[in-house]
Amino acid sequence: LGKEAAVKAIKEWGQPKSKITHLIFCTTSGVDMPGADYQLTKLLGLRPYVKRYMMYQQGCFAGGTVLRLAKDLAENNKGARVLVVCSEVTAVTFRGPSDTHLDSLVGQALFGDGAAALIVGSDPIPEIEKPIFEMVWTAQTIAPDSEGAIDGHLREAGLTFHLLKDVPGIVSKNIDKALVEAFQPLNISDYNSIFWIAHPGGPAILDQVEQKLGLKPEKMKATREVLSEYGNMSSACVLFILDEMRKKSAQQGLKTTGEGLDWGVLFGFGPGLTIETVVLHSVAL
């Protein structure tokens, strides 16, 4: 699954795969040695000295984590081109219903399989590389008083997830602080004036965030469409939403990849409860 996504990303990028300097692979679907990063390097025929980073068991916030790491690598290694791949196969979480763990049914109802890939770099080559979004600022934080809100354990039975019912409340309670930290330096306080890419942990989370911030329903349109079409694909979701947004923006003749707007936010929520924040700037279409 990850290979298919990577092949598509490299083709659209338009550069030879020999130009890839770093690989970040993220999955919550299993643990192997050598890891999925090694397997993908072999499957794609990448150079053996590509610098690899393997992220296991991070959960749903990791779509933001991989972007943050890729940004740091690209900015601190001149000429770096980072292949980012998130691949999730949620069959490892599937099991029969249990009276003692009804919360795991919520996850099984929401989860889906998916893989997404992109290339991250700085100083794009004119006429060859066509950026889609620019990452301006990133942050990671642990929400206060949230320990145990989302957790997972890899055991003989597979991957078990446990979700507290107040997860949507914890996310909505902490999102305002994250937004102020991200957008105050840009003098942005109207969150309807930016585009939104939020990890769709479930409809209840999106509903509470909309209500808390007074967001217009169309702000979460791309997010809800991905959740409806594919389910919660853990780390891959926010990358699917990025793709959905830039394609719809082009189809509708809007002026930027971010629904015609300049600034936007990408949020990842997951075990901890951990929140990843990425401030994005769109690119003219």
Swiss-Prot record:
Q: Which UniProt keywords apply?
A: Acyltransferase, Flavonoid biosynthesis, Transferase
Cross-referenced PROSITE patterns: CHALCONE_SYNTH
Record InterPro entries: Chalcone/stilbene_synt_C, Chalcone/stilbene_synt_N, Chalcone/stilbene_synthase_AS, Polyketide_synthase_type-III, Thiolase-like
Please list the reactions this protein catalyses.
(E)-4-coumaroyl-CoA + 3 malonyl-CoA + 3 H(+) = 2',4,4',6'-tetrahydroxychalcone + 3 CO2 + 4 CoA
Q: In which pathway does it act?
A: Secondary metabolite biosynthesis; flavonoid biosynthesis
Chain segments annotated as transmembrane: none
Write out the catalytic residues in the record: C60
SUPFAM superfamilies attached to this UniProt entry: Thiolase-like (SSF53901)
List its EC numbers.
2.3.1.74
One GO term in the molecular function aspect is: naringenin-chalcone synthase activity
Decide whether keyword rRNA-binding is in the record. no
Q: Which GO terms describe its biological process?
A: flavonoid biosynthetic process; polyketide biosynthetic process
Q: Does the keyword Secreted apply?
A: no
| Similarity remark | Belongs to the thiolase-like superfamily. Chalcone/stilbene synthases family.
Xref: PANTHER family: CHALCONE SYNTHASE 7 (PTHR11877:SF62), HYDROXYMETHYLGLUTARYL-COA SYNTHASE (PTHR11877)
Purpose of the protein: The primary product of this enzyme is 4,2',4',6'-tetrahydroxychalcone (also termed naringenin-chalcone or chalcone) which can under specific conditions spontaneously isomerize into naringenin.
Q: Could you tell me what this protein is called? A: Chalcone synthase 6-4
Species source reads: Medicago sativa (Alfalfa)
Give the classification, highest ranks: Eukaryota, Viridiplantae, Streptophyta, Embryophyta, Tracheophyta
State the encoding gene: CHS6-4
